[in-house]
Amino acid sequence: MQRALRINIGQLEANMQADDDGVERRVDSGFIDITARDATGRLVVIELKTGMAGQRAVAQILSYMGDVAAEEDTAEIRGMLVAFDFDHKAKAAAKMVPSLELVKYGFRFEFSKA
C-alpha cells in the first residue's frame, strides 16, 4: 500500500510530493511511513493503516509529528492518517487536532490480459 501511495501521492493532495527518498524516516517514536511536502512546502507526516484505525493510530501519528517538529524546529507540521476507516475514538481525538487529517482510502482492480 505504501508503494502505491508513493506512486500516486498527488491523488492524496494536489501538488504533494514525497520528501523522504522512498525510505521511511526514523524518529525517536518509530518509523514514519511517508514524509512529504504539500504545495506550500509544509512538511506532512503520513501514516498508513490497513483496515480500521483507532485512537492508538492517532496517538502514533501525533508522536511522529511531535518528533518531526522538534527535529525541524518548527510547529508547522501537518499529519495525514490514511486508513480504510476510522473508529469513533479516532475521529473524536482527531477533531481536537486541526493539523491532523483523517483520510479514507478505497481501491479498485484493473485487469488486462498479458
Report each predicted region and the residues it spans.
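Charged, terminal alpha-helix-loop-beta segments
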Residues: 1-114
